[in-house]
């Protein structure tokens, strides 16, 4: 199985929907944490995160709390501390206060983090939700989502859905990805889809 590269999305600014607004002070606070993480100044980022969690958001189920929990997850994930990141991403989703598109971002981040610790059985239902919501509300479902679905199913020896999703990923890709094509070829051979394998072998 090819190595899956963890792709962490760190926003450069805080975006909010018309239904969810935060104060300028809070926006500056979150941006300050983003900047510390981006600069790899983890001590300062942790201080700000702990201050917010302990003094303002402990046990909170507000939009601001959800953003803080997501940031906490990013803080750990970008340092490859995936086990520590997982409960924070889970907590952000559990608030049920994220705008729909923001929740999609957290789902993908959480799915990647599950993958990195080998919890493939958790990746699949999470990304199924991601895909269903994306299709329902016309949000983009990138090739990377299908790739992660394919790798997770493959690790669980669920080769039919793994093959379906790697085909989706290859079809969506702007240019041929050699690793993806080779993985699709290996799955086609496992499933005895010899015609498909022949086509893939010429790409």
Regions found by a protein language model. Give the residues of each.
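Residue-level signature for tetratricopeptide repeat
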Residues: 35, 75, 113, 152, ...
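Structural register within alpha-helical repeat arrays
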Residues: 32, 72, 110, 149, ...
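Flexible helix-coil transition and linker loops at the boundaries of alpha-helical arrays
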Residues: 54-63, 94-102, 132-140, 173-175
């Amino acid at each position: 199985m090819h190595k899956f590269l963890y792709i962490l999305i760190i926003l450069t600014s805080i975006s909010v929907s018309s239904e969810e607004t935060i104060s300028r002070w809070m926006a500056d606070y979150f941006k300050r944490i983003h900047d510390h993480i981006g600069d790899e100044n983890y001590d300062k980022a942790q201080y700000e995160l702990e201050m917010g969690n302990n003094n303002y958001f402990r046990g909170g189920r507000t939009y601001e709390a959800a953003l803080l929990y997501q940031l906490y997850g990013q803080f750990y994930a970008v340092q490859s501390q995936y086990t520590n990141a997982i409960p924070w991403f889970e907590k952000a989703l559990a608030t049920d206060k994220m705008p729909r598109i923001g929740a999609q971002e957290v789902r993908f981040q959480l799915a990647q983090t599950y993958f990195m610790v080998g919890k493939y059985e958790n990746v699949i239902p999470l990304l199924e939700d991601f895909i269903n919501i994306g299709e329902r509300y016309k949000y983009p479902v990138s090739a990377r989502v299908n790739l992660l679905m394919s790798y997770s199913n493959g690790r669980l020896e669920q080769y039919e859905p793994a093959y379906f999703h790697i085909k989706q990923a290859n079809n969506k890709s702007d240019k041929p990805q050699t690793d993806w094509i080779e993985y699709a070829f290996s799955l086609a051979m496992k499933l005895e889809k010899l015609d498909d394998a022949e086509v893939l072998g010429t790409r």
